[in-house]
């Protein structure tokens, strides 16, 4: 997994892939869009959103 820009459905698909059956949660104040869409996201950053 390479750091990359993830926006919209690509971001959701990446979260499903990383989190698996645990699912994930959305924290508006955490800025996942700023982190992953405007900037680039690492696998570690995505895992922070898993349940």
UniProtKB/Swiss-Prot annotation:
Gene Ontology molecular functions: hormone activity
Transmembrane residue ranges: none
Principal subcellular localization: secreted
Matching SMART domains: IlGF
Location(s), subcellular: Secreted
Annotated SUPFAM superfamilies: Insulin-like
Keyword Ligase: no
Pfam families per record: Insulin
Family the entry assigns: Belongs to the insulin family.
Name of the protein this chain belongs to: Insulin
Taxonomic lineage: Eukaryota, Metazoa, Chordata, Craniata, Vertebrata
Gene name in the database record: INS
């Amino acid at each position: 997994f390479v750091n990359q820009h993830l926006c919209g459905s690509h971001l959701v698909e990446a979260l499903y892939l990383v989190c698996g059956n645990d699912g994930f949660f959305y924290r508006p104040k955490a800025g996942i869009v700023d982190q992953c869409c405007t900037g680039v996201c690492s696998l570690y950053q995505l895992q922070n959103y898993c349940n």
